[in-house]
Amino acid sequence: MIDLNADLGEGFGRWELTDDERLLSVVTSANVACGFHAGDAATMRRVCELAAERGVRIGAQVSYRDLAGFGRRAMDVPPAELAAEVAYQIGALEVFARAAGTRVSYVKPHGALYNRVVHDEGQAGAVVDGVRLADASLPVLGLPGSRLLEVAEKAGLPVVTEAFADRAYTEEGTLVPRGEDGAVVTDPDAVVERSVNLARLGVVDAHSGRRIPVRARSLCLHGDTPGAVELARRVRSRLEASGVRVAAFA
């Protein structure tokens, strides 16, 4: 079994980045922007309502406070401040989730914060503190072997490992930085093949060409890539044709 998640609600005001409604007909979990890197109150409410109608799980995609940089700029935020901001984002999304008749089911960091907590125990601890402040029962979604999942597990939080079909990997199992050539896999056929290999075999071909183990319960497809909806449909169809059950982890 594998969960399919995508980043949604990443518009702001009249500007829309992702085709939320169509993607929600394919994925099983939605990482909803909570206003710090993208998203606003109206967008958060609408995505929660659409997700609830389709039975899609809602996750809080928490970020550094960085609207101008889409949450992809490295920042040094004091741990206490970061913990408060993580809790704030979860709480804001929870209001709209409950109004739609559902709830926030998990938490996933975004962008620079996601990459930072792979190695930085202090920032990872701040994220975990923020999750515990909001709801200590919430699972944390992250990269296998990351400091985030280690700290979360020690703190008693449920953890869920995640893999990326459309991102390049280093041989160490981390993501190739977006600024490097080939960091994003754009060939649809390659993304589909990588998805099946990750779900069935627990492996992926690293940027170097070496095949590495990546065990994950959830597979992320980015909603802001060209042709994201059709690609997501192809991935899900191929997974199911390969005998993989696609269902939410939460």
From Swiss-Prot:
It comes from Streptomyces avermitilis (strain ATCC 31267 / DSM 46492 / JCM 5070 / NBRC 14893 / NCIMB 12804 / NRRL 8165 / MA-4680). Keywords: ATP-binding, Hydrolase, Nucleotide-binding. Signal peptide: none annotated. Forms a complex composed of PxpA, PxpB and PxpC. CDD domains: LamB_YcsF_like. It catalyses: 5-oxo-L-proline + ATP + 2 H2O = L-glutamate + ADP + phosphate + H(+). Its EC number is 3.5.2.9. Belongs to the LamB/PxpA family. The keyword Hydrolase applies. Catalyzes the cleavage of 5-oxoproline to form L-glutamate coupled to the hydrolysis of ATP to ADP and inorganic phosphate. This is 5-oxoprolinase subunit A. PANTHER family: 5-OXOPROLINASE SUBUNIT A, UNCHARACTERIZED PROTEIN YBGL-RELATED. One of its GO terms (biological process) is carbohydrate metabolic process. It holds the Pfam family LamB_YcsF. The gene is pxpA. One of its GO terms (molecular function) is 5-oxoprolinase (ATP-hydrolyzing) activity.
